[in-house]
Regions:
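ATP-binding/phosphotransfer module of carbohydrate and carboxylate kinases, centering on a glycine-rich
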Residues: 1-59, 69-72, 90-100, 115-122, ...
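Residue-level detector of high-confidence beta-strand sites
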Residues: 27-29, 78, 147
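Active-site nucleophile and cofactor-binding loops and adjacent substrate-binding regions
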Residues: 80-81, 101-107, 127-130, 286-293
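Conserved PLP phosphate-binding loop immediately N-terminal to the Schiff-base lysine helix
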Residues: 103-117
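Glycine-rich phosphate-binding loop of actin/hexokinase-like ATP-binding domains
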Residues: 122-184
C-alpha cells in the first residue's frame, strides 16, 4: 500500500510517497499559500499529482505546526494561522474522498524515527526538534501519543527544570510564559545566551548568528564560547532528564539544527545521570536518521504498517 505524507509548513508544503518498505516513490514541494482555501487546493493537487505519476491511490497523512483538538476536531496553536479553527482533516477528506489523518509535526518526527529511523524497534520514543524553536513529540509502538488534550509532547513550553537564580525571568517565551525550555535550549536561545555573555565581557567581536558560529569558536578553545556551550549542555541535560523522570522513554531522538552538533552526544550521558532520579541513566540519546525529511515521512507513517 502506498502511503503519502504531507508536511504543511509555514513557507512550503511537501509531499512524499512511501512504499510498504519505506522506500521513497515520489517527492514534490510547493510554496504554501497564505490562505486556507489555497492551502487545501495545494495539498489536494499534490496528492492527485503523486497518484497520477505512480498510477495508484494511497493513504494520506498530514503533519501540521499545531494540534487538532480531540474535543472540537479543530486545529489550534498553529503558526500557519489560517488553518486555526478549521477541521482540516474533514475538509481534506471530503476533497480527496478518503480519511485523512492529521497530527502535530513533532509527533510525526517521533513516529518517523520510531518506525524505521534512528529509534526503530523502541517501544516509547521521545522525539525532540531543536532549531529556531523547540518542539517534541511522543510515539508509542510507532503511533502518535497525542494525549487527552492533543498536546502530548509540548515539553518546550514547560519551565526550565532546576533553574539557577541567574536563569529566573531571563526571557519571556512567545507563548507568554517566562523561562520556557525553548528559550534556553533552542538554537535561538543558545545564540542569545552567547551574545549576552559576549556583551557582558566587553569583547569586541561580531555577534554570533547561529549555533554553528559558536561551535567553531568552541573548537578553537574560545573561553566565552566554551562557557556558553557548557551552560547549554547542562540546560539540555536538565530538560531531557525531566522527561526521563516522568516518561522514561526507551530512546530520545534529536532533530533540528542543534542535533547536528556532534559534541552533544558524548557529553550527555554523564550529565543526564546527574539529574535523573537514582543518579543512573542508560537512555540512548541519538541523532535522527532522516534529517529534514523525517517529519514528512512520519506523516506518511500515520497510516501504520
Amino acid at each position: 500500500m502506498m502511503r503519502m505524507g504531507v508536511d504543511l509548513g509555514g513557507t512550503k508544503i511537501e509531499l512524499v510517497a512511501l512504499s510498504d518498505e519505506g522506500n521513497e516513490l515520489f517527492r514534490k514541494r510547493v510554496t504554501t499559500p497564505r490562505d486556507y482555501q489555497g492551502t487545501l487546493t495545494a495539498v489536494v493537487d499534490l496528492v492527485k499529482e503523486a497518484e497520477a505519476t505512480l498510477g495508484e491511490k494511497g493513504t494520506v497523512g498530514v503533519g501540521i505546526p499545531g494540534v487538532v483538538s480531540p474535543y472540537s476536531g479543530l486545529v489550534k496553536n498553529a503558526n500557519s494561522t489560517w488553518i486555526n479553527g478549521q477541521p482540516l482533516d474533514v475538509h481534506l477528506g471530503e476533497l480527496l474522498q478518503r480519511e485523512v489523518r492529521v497530527a502535530n509535526d513533532a509527533n510525526c518526527f517521533a513516529v518517523s524515527e520510531a518506525v524505521d529511523g534512528a529509534a526503530a524497534g523502541a517501544s516509547v520514543v521521545f522525539g525532540v526538534i531543536i532549531g529556531t524553536g523547540c518542539g517534541a513529540g511522543v510515539a508509542i509502538n510507532g503511533k502518535v501519543h497525542g494525549g487527552g488534550n492533543g498536546i502530548g509532547g509540548e515539553w518546550g513550553h514547560n519551565p526550565l527544570p532546576w533553574m539557577t537564580k541567574e536563569e529566573f525571568n531571563t526571557t519571556r517565551c512567545f507563548c507568554g510564559n517566562p523561562d520556557c525550555i525553548e528559550t534556553f535550549i533552542s538554537g535561538t536561545g543558545f545564540v542569545r545566551d552567547y551574545n549576552a555573555a559576549l556583551t557582558a565581557a566587553g569583547t569586541v567581536r561580531a555577534a554570533a548568528k547561529s549555533g554553528a558560529d559558536i561551535m567553531l569558536l568552541v573548537d578553537e578553545g574560545d573561553a566565552i564560547a566554551v562557557a556558553a556551550f557548557d551552560r547549554y549542555m547542562d540546560r539540555l541535560a536538565r530538560s531531557l532528564a525531566h522527561v526521563i523522570n516522568m516518561l522514561d522513554p526507551d530512546a530520545i531522538v534529536l532533530g533540528g539544527g542543534m542535533s547536528n552538533v556532534a559534541a552533544i552526544y558524548p557529553r550527555l550521558p554523564a550529565l543526564l545521570a546527574h539529574y535523573v532520579v537514582g543518579r543512573e541513566c542508560h537512555t540512548p540519546v541519538v541523532q535522527n536518521l532522516y534529517g529534514c525529511s523525517s517529519g514528512v515521512r512520519g506523516a506518511a507513517w500515520l497510516w501504520e504498517k
